[in-house]
Amino acid sequence: LAAHAEGLQLIWIPPERCTHADLAVLPSLAARLPGLRHVAASYLYRGDDVARINRLDRAAKAAGLAILATNDVHYHAPDRRPLQDVMTCIREGVTIDRAGRLLNPNAERHLKSPTEMARLFARWPDALAQTRIVADACAFSLTHLAYEYPNETVPEGATPESHLAALTWAGAAN
């Protein structure tokens, strides 16, 4: 990564259940990756958010980094959580009634407004300021996005639709 990171702004996204061992690697990462300047901090609504973000802030500062006010977004609006749950079940190969703790416990993984982010991160104003700096440095527009439909890989003699139907029926039979 270090060989290809010139000109990039790197952000360390801690694991959801971040341990002291995870945080202990920050000084080493910061030394080897000059573009690493930030640690992502998100509200996960598990009851430990303030303590967890404070721990991330201390570890980031000790490594010469700063935290960013981020939002672990999985969908754009709370009412899209059921779709996220279905996608999680597909990824994990389980049914919705057996997914249990594989699913997020609430519908808070949606985009938050600037006002809501300011409220959530009022204890860490530097995190909000750093997030603004990173966002302002980004040169992105939705017009840069264009969907490129992938080439269909289907058996000889089949159409994409007939192959999908065959796979669907085979999966349903299992």
Regions found by a protein language model. Give the residues of each.
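Phosphodiester-processing cores and adjacent nucleic acid-binding clamps
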Residues: 1-174
